């Protein structure tokens, strides 16, 4: 995604994710939400996941180190995560969704973020596979003309002594090496979460990451940047703390659980060119992403060459570009041996070209059409279209709507016949066999939104959406043994297992819903923002036809109240409600619903000096208990947060 050189303002939010280039958020051909730098500062968000909890249509699944982002009823695997428009994807080193939330751990510290842009709904016409549910784009601060920086540190202390405390520090620094020619910026972040003393609770987690960007500006029209990024995560679960010490019985033998320690490493290199000319804007980047899971001997590399170029002529803004990608995976976990040979390395190449034109037919109406052609060496070609209109009948109303397609290619292991991935969570010995006949998953999304703003102190919006999902890849059990783990009654090529599965395209599903937003500047110093989301999912085929698809609450309500009590003191309050979820499809069977819950948070921000920010907050004020037994996950009870930020 190209980066805007314009500063964020309250009057005109500028976004780049919807079309690839800077435009006003209200005119973007997508349902898009912006979390501005002011929001990040005044609401004292702890990390990116915390900020996304207030976005309509977004569900933060799991908790703590296992948080994942789902949009509009689609699972977290269908949400594309970007940092400055560049893809972040390490799912290849955590098969079967082990240790959810890894991608969130790669995000930069809050102090380095300029804004966050969220597209709700498919964006495959522009971004390709993985953007089937939506896109989260983290826009970081740019290289400064004069030396500046900030450091932010905070601590979260649990009211319950059984819960683990969290400590984190983030640093951002930027400035010129050669004035107006060469600049540098960098970030560093350290976060440590202590392990809970609750069975099924939060694991101990330590995250360390940093990046360095050299920015060369030979003239006003061109910028060349080279970036190196390194991130490390470690997770530790201890028997008797978060792991149940009770032994399991298999064939009359006791098996005792053991401690779990998992490390994840990510390294990224990128070279980017941006050009800004009178009627032509361009961005091209080459990126290499390396993801490592040494505890499971998995190593993944993703190499991407991407270009976007926008031409403006007459009433048109034409965006054309392309992408080439190579995926490589080294994994010693293959359980299948064919002819005495075990496949441990997988590779796949793909490329795409796309074009998108915004045609302003009349001053009040713009029509955007997109077309993307993808070529995959395993799946052949795929065409992804989009047609979207934006109508502004007057200066208070905007009506937007359109139809867009989405698609997602199968993961490397899932699409390889000679691959058998171990599974079973350590209790059962199971295997998932790859299937080269898998087809990409596809969706058709229709949405219509009405947005009103009196350009003074009131704004409201209402969006209707419907997504038809087909060729969903589902794990189907081809052999199921008895209920006693370790009996190994299923056979495959001379090997014995408790169960054997294969992934197949079997299901169709529908996701539909309503998103409503309301913003009211009650007084010059008092702001109220609220949003409500209704989501309904239904499987249209397969063994569970008529049943819900995902573990999503049907009703979500978020509201925040901000009061600037004094020029140096502001207070905030937040309420997040999640209704009872429906029963949902887990990997191979329907799972029970989980109860509703409501969290209330509140805090203060005090600025004794322009360069100093002091924050304090109470999260889950009423100490609502969300535990593994009733909810399938553990969320923190009441906790207290204090923070300090210094900007120079």
Model-derived segments and spans:
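Extracytoplasmic beta-strand/coil segments of soluble accessory domains associated
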Residues: 49-90, 114
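Structural signature of Gram-negative outer-membrane beta-barrels, strongest in the C-terminal barrel
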Residues: 219, 227-229, 344-470, 536, ...
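Short acidic/polar hinge/loop motifs at secondary-structure boundaries
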Residues: 88-120
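N-terminal periplasmic accessory domains that precede
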Residues: 48-51, 67-70, 81-84, 103-109, ...
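Surface-exposed extracellular loop regions of Gram-negative outer-membrane beta-barrel proteins
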Residues: 87, 92, 242-245, 328-335, ...
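Outer membrane beta-barrel strand-and-loop segments of large Gram-negative receptors
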Residues: 304-310, 321, 346, 352-354, ...
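Gram-negative outer-membrane beta-barrel transporters
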Residues: 152, 360-367, 466-468, 489-585, ...
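Periplasmic-side early beta-strands and strand-to-turn transitions of outer-membrane beta-barrels
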Residues: 144-262, 471
């Amino acid at each position: 995604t190209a980066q805007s050189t314009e500063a964020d303002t309250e009057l005109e939010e500028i976004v780049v994710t919807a079309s690839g280039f800077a435009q006003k958020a209200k005119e973007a051909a997508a349902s898009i939400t912006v979390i501005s730098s002011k929001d990040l500062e005044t609401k004292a968000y702890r990390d990116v996941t915390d900020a996304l909890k207030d976005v309509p249509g977004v569900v933060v699944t799991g908790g703590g180190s296992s948080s994942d982002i789902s949009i509009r009823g689609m699972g977290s695997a269908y949400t594309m995560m970007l940092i400055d428009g560049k893809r972040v994807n390490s799912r290849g080193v955590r098969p079967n969704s082990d240790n959810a939330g890894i991608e969130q751990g790669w995000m930069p510290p809050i102090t380095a973020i300029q804004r966050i842009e969220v597209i709700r709904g498919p964006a495959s016409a522009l971004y390709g596979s993985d953007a089937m549910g939506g896109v989260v784009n983290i826009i970081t601060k740019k290289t400064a003309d004069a030396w500046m920086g900030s450091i932010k540190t905070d601590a979260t202390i649990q009211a319950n002594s059984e819960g683990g405390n969290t400590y984190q520090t983030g640093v951002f620094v930027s400035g010129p090496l050669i004035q107006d020619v060469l600049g540098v910026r960098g970030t560093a972040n350290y976060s440590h979460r202590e392990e809970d003393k609750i069975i099924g609770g939060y694991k101990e987690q330590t995250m360390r990451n940093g990046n360095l960007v050299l920015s060369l500006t030979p003239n006003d029209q061109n910028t060349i940047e080279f970036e190196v990024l390194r991130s490390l995560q470690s997770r530790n679960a201890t028997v008797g703390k978060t792991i149940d010490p009770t032994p399991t019985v298999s064939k009359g033998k006791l098996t005792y659980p053991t401690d779990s320690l998992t490390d994840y490493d990510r390294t990224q290199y990128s070279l980017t060119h941006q050009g800004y000319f009178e009627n032509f804007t361009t961005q091209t980047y080459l990126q290499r992403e390396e993801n490592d899971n040494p505890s499971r001997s998995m190593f993944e590399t993703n190499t991407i060459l991407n270009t976007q170029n926008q031409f403006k002529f007459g009433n048109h803004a034409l965006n054309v570009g392309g992408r080439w990608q190579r995926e490589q995976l080294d994994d010693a976990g293959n359980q299948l041996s064919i002819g005495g040979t075990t496949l441990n390395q997988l590779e796949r190449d793909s490329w795409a070209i796309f074009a998108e034109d915004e045609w302003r037919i009349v001053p009040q109406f713009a029509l955007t059409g997109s077309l993307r052609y993808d070529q995959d060496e395993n799946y052949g070609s795929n065409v992804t279209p989009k047609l979207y209109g934006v109508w502004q009948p007057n200066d208070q109303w905007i009506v937007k709507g359109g139809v867009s397609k989405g698609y997602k290619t199968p993961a490397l292991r899932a699409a390889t016949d000679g691959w058998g991935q171990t599974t079973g969570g350590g209790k059962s010995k199971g295997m998932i066999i790859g299937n080269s006949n898998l087809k990409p998953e596809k969706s058709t999304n229709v949405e219509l939104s009405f947005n009103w703003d009196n350009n003074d102190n009131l704004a409201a919006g209402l969006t209707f959406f419907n997504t038809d999902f087909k060729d969903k890849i589902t794990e189907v059990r081809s052999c199921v043994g008895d209920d006693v783990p370790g009996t190994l009654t299923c056979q495959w090529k001379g090997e014995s297992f408790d169960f054997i599965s294969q992934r197949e395209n079997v299901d169709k599903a529908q996701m539909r819903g309503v998103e409503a937003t309301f913003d009211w500047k009650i007084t010059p110093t008092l702001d109220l923002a609220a949003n409500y989301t209704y989501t309904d999912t239904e499987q249209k085929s397969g063994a569970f036809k008529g049943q819900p698809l995902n573990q999503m609450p049907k009703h979500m309500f978020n509201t925040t109240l901000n009061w600037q009590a004094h020029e140096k003191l502001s207070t905030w309050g937040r309420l997040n409600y999640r209704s009872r979820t429906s029963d949902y499809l887990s990997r191979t069977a329907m799972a029970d619903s989980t109860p509703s819950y409501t969290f209330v948070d509140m805090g203060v921000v005090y600025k004794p000096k322009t360069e100093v920010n002091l924050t304090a907050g109470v999260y889950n004020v009423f100490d609502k208990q969300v535990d593994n037994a009733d909810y399938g996950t553990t969320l923190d009870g009441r906790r207290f947060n204090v923070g300090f930020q210094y900007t120079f």
